[in-house]
């Protein structure tokens, strides 16, 4: 474990769960990720209580036009795999597969064992919702675990817990366990660009849901995971 942070947010915990269970917000909330991942055509799987979607990394979003030079996010992905972007001679469309092949071929010298992972798991994000309030972003080299906790006194607030786990190469020393870091509401300390961007929407979303003019949500097919989540909660409340 390399990180352990709790932030107090001005929204209900279920709004936070929803924010990490659909991908269409990427274009507006995380525009930098359009140069790094596929955000339109995602596999969505629903289970009895849980759900997931699979996000291909190492591809340009169909929302952006291809450019001549490899964009910085894809260069970072190449470097993260141990490759030199300057020496990469393939096309941009082949970066995802090239990273998969390189990580597979060099796993032993990198001190890692990917033998039980298929190729897509070497690059992509496997985003799970473990009902009712745990989200994981699962990758070959790391795991980001989020817990969305109700506030004990105020339904318009919540606690967002972040744990970061990283795969330590064989033979390397494990880093010391991080100390728990608490961020009260209004803190300007960053949780990381992507999480900060998600958090920036949630207080406004909560205000909108509290409006007298808000009758309820109409959820589209893109929001299958949200529909499944709230249906499961309703089923529990009706028991």
Predicted ranges, named:
Residues 1-239:
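C-terminal catalytic domain of Rieske-type non-heme iron oxygenases
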